[in-house]
């Protein structure tokens, strides 16, 4: 199979082909996900919660992400590899550039940043310097203390319009991919239709171009709170590779996410 790039995902969007993404943190799981056909792998700052045992993602460092990116890279042959830029690692232009370079040198093909209008100059700067950017809107976990918890975003008209406007602005600034998290399904659909770049949803309904989940949720090994938008595929298949194939198949045929995984 040929390597997945941002151009591949744009082609999928144009063809109406739904694609899948998962988080990954080591070479073994990354290799299994990659060989089964997962299109995008994200070394997420979610590792702070699922690997390190924190209550949120804020303690994660650039060194943490770089280490796990290098691990995942060794297991990947096909999937597009994205690395999260963690909390307070992109506050100034110089810091943003230096930290993004660290992640690219560790093996990432793209970096992901959370935020809206305030990020536009950073997105433009990174893109102009050859570092592809995935933007992230809606529930941005690094802002959990501002939101007052992990809450659905964009439910009122003003905030929905703000998120849509930010999505368009981030695309114009050069973002090649967008993640929307925990927003109402109609808003996610409007964003997906308004943009030419691919949109990946998590807790955002079935009308985005792709879906992403945390691997621990897909495999039923998360402890504590289980998000409404997640699904335990290992429970229904009994085997890891079969679980991943079931996830890919259900995204492709539109049966995941179902209504019970969606916010309105």
UniProtKB/Swiss-Prot annotation:
GO terms for molecular function: 3-methyl-2-oxobutanoate hydroxymethyltransferase activity; magnesium ion binding. It holds the Pfam family Pantoate_transf. GO terms for cellular component: cytoplasm. InterPro entries: Pantoate_hydroxy_MeTrfase, Pyrv/PenolPyrv_kinase-like_dom, Pyrv_kinase-like_dom_sf. Gene3D superfamilies: Phosphoenolpyruvate-binding domains (3.20.20.60). It comes from the Bacteria. Coiled coil: none annotated. The active site is at 181 (proton acceptor). Signal peptide: none annotated. Homodecamer; pentamer of dimers. PANTHER family: 3-METHYL-2-OXOBUTANOATE HYDROXYMETHYLTRANSFERASE. Belongs to the PanB family. This is 3-methyl-2-oxobutanoate hydroxymethyltransferase.
């Amino acid at each position: 199979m040929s390597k997945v790039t941002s151009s591949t995902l744009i082609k999928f969007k144009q063809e109406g082909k739904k694609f899948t993404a998962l988080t990954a943190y080591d070479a073994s799981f990354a290799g299994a996900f990659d060989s089964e056909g997962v299109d995008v792998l994200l070394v997420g700052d979610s590792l702070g919660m699922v690997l390190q045992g924190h209550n949120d993602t804020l303690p994660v460092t650039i060194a943490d992400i770089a280490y796990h990116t290098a691990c995942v890279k060794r297991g990947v042959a096909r999937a597009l590899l994205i690395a999260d830029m963690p909390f307070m690692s992109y506050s100034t232009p110089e810091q943003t550039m230096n930290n993004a370079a660290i992640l690219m040198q560790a093996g990432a093909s793209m970096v992901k940043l959370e935020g809206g209008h305030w990020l536009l100059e950073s997105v433009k700067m990174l893109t102009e310097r050859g570092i592809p950017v995935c933007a992230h809107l809606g529930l941005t976990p690094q802002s959990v203390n501002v939101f007052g918890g992990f809450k659905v975003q964009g439910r009122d008209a003003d905030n929905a319009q703000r998120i849509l406007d930010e999505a368009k602005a981030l695309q114009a600034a050069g973002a090649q991919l967008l993640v929307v998290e925990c927003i109402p399904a109609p808003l996610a659909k409007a964003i997906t239709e308004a943009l030419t770049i691919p949109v990946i949803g998590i807790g955002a309904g079935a009308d985005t171009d792709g879906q992403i989940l945390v691997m621990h949720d897909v495999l039923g090994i998360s402890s504590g709170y289980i998000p409404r938008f997640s699904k335990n595929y290992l429970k229904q298949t009994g085997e890891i590779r079969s679980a991943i194939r079931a996830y890919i198949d259900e995204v492709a045929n539109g049966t995941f996410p179902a209504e019970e995984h969606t916010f309105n």
